Amino acid sequence: MNPWRRYSWEIALAALLIFEILAFGLINPRLLDINVLLFSTSDFICIGIVALPLTMVIVSGGMDISFGSTIGLCAITLGVLFQLGMPLPLAIIITLLLGAICGLINAGLIIYTGVNPLVITLGTMYLFGGSALLLSGMAGATGYEGIGGFPTAFTDFANISFLGIPMPLIFFLVCCLFFWLLMHRTHMGRNVFLIGQSARVAQYSAIPVNRTLYTVYAMTGCASAIAAVLLVSYFGSARSDLGASFLMPAITAVVLGGANIYGGSGSIMGSALAALLVGFLQQGLQMAGVPNQISSALSGALLIVVVVGRSVSLHRHQILEWYSRRRNAHQA
C-alpha cells in the first residue's frame, strides 16, 4: 500500500497539529518560541504517556477508564512510602508495581466475570480513587498541598532538559517508540489486533487471549504509575487528585488518533499525535485566556465529533446504500 495512503490519517493529524500551533501563535506569539513550545508540553504530556498503552487496550476490544484514579493512587502511595522513611528509588519501584497490579486487577475481573470492560473499570475507578482518598486522609495529606518534602534532585527531574528537550517529553518519545514497536512490529501486537477483531476466532486460533489482555491492562497501569511519578516530580508534591483531569483528554486522544472504539484497529503514531493535538488545544486556550470550563467543554465536543465521524466512516457504505434506496424510492 502507498505509504501516503496508509498513513493518511496520521499525516492529517500532523498537519492539523502544525496549523493549531500556528493559529494559537497568532493569538499569543509566546507559543511560537521553541523553548516555550517544548516546555509547555510538560503540563500535559502525561496524557500521551497513558494514551499509548490505552490504545492497545481499546484496539483489543477493551476499555479502561480507571487510569486517572490509578495515577492518583500511585501518586499518594509514593508520597506515603517516602513519608514513612522508605528510600525514594525503592518507593518508585513499588509505585510502578502497584500500577501494574491495578491493571492486572482490571484484566482479571474482565476475563473471569465476562462483564463489559467499561462497567468493570468504572467500578475500579471508584475503588482506586476511594483508596487514594483513604490513604491521603490517613497520611494527613488533605487539600491541595499533598505530601511534599521530596529531595531536590527528584523534584528537579521533571523540570530539567536533555539537549534542550524536557525530560517528560523524552519519556513520552521513548514510550512512543516502545509501544509502536510492540504494537506494529511484534506477534503480541498482531494478537492485539486479532483479539479486537474477534476474540472468539482468536481463541480458536490458539492465540493467548487472556495473557495478552493481562499484558495490555498491566502496561496501562504501569504507564499510569510512570505518569504519577513524573507528576509528583513536576509539582513537587504527591496528591490523590493528580490524575483526575486525564480521563477525557486521554480517551479523546486515542479515538482521535484513529482507534476504533469497538476494537480491531488503531495506531500508536496516531494516538501520539492526537495527544499532542489535544494537549496543545488545552494549552493554547489557556494561554489565550479561555476558562478551563470552556476548554473542557471543547475537549468533550471534540470527542463526540470524532466518535460520530468515525462511526459514519465505518458505516459509510451502508449509509450510501440507504440513501440510494431512498432516492430511488422517491423517483419511483
Curated annotation (Swiss-Prot):
Compartment list: Cell inner membrane
Single GO molecular function: transmembrane transporter activity
InterPro entries in UniProt: ABC_transp_permease
GO-annotated cellular components: plasma membrane
Transmembrane residue ranges: 7-27, 45-65, 70-90, 91-111, 118-138, 162-182, 216-236, 240-260, 261-281, 288-308
Protein induction: In the absence of AI-2, repressed by LsrR. Induced by AI-2, via release of the LsrR repressor.
Topology of this chain in the membrane: Multi-pass membrane protein
Keywords: Cell inner membrane, Cell membrane, Membrane, Transmembrane, Transmembrane helix, Transport
Subunit text: The complex is composed of two ATP-binding proteins (LsrA), two transmembrane proteins (LsrC and LsrD) and a solute-binding protein (LsrB).
Protein name: Autoinducer 2 import system permease protein LsrD
Origin organism lineage: Bacteria, Pseudomonadati, Pseudomonadota, Gammaproteobacteria, Enterobacterales
Gene (UniProt): lsrD
